[in-house]
Amino acid sequence: MVVSSVCVFSGTSFTGSDFLPQAVNNKLDEMASDGSLQEIIDEYVRLGFNNIFLRSLNPYGFAKQYKEKIAYPIDEFIANYKEGLDYIIELNKQGTFFIEGFAALLLKRMLTPFATGFVDLQSPAGVGIAGAIYDYDGSVYVSDEARMMARFKNFYFKLGNVNENSYEEMFNGELLHNIIASSCTECLPGCSECVFQPYCGADPVRNMSEQGDMVGFRPTNEMCKKTKAIMHYLFELLKKHDPEINRIFWSWIK
């Protein structure tokens, strides 16, 4: 299997790709604990990868359970992300084609009329519509994050079970209807009037895990703060009208 995209948690926590050799994962974990994001990027380039997805820590599973030990302020992640993106842009300017995955997704939304298929940035939310997760026991969840929540006894986003429920019951039921109604950014408080609304989306599963309901509260929502900050930074870079930066960005989304 060829893997061209890997995901990292920058800051104080890091998860390497499961497809990488354990020795490589150990090395990347060691570098990440020191906050050496540039070294991590260099290591992926050295290994022949051309794509990295810089992610903040997600509020699911063990990451949520041990949040007090491993979490970091979202402002710290945003600062690290900008530094990482700047470094990746410089690599591209020097002739190394290398994509930052989240920026590429946002740029496609910002610069083209085409969808990305990224479930976390859809309106209404893509969970249960653009995809669903079938677990080993027949349980069906709206997303993998919903499955992770179920591991910790939160079954709110379980659509049903293939051994007990029909397709119509699961995918045309009250739960999925409520998710759709609660995740249209065009009418959500804090989203409907946001300048970035056309390029963004809702994540009811994350909102429930982080803030206790599907709608969430934008002023304290970390995903909202992170996404807006990154979009703002991308627009700042575009406003420079730098031919090299524009060429690089378009190469990421073609």
Protein language model features and the residues they cover:
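Flexible mid-to-C-terminal extensions adjoining Fe-S/redox cofactors in radical SAM and related proteins
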Residues: 150-254
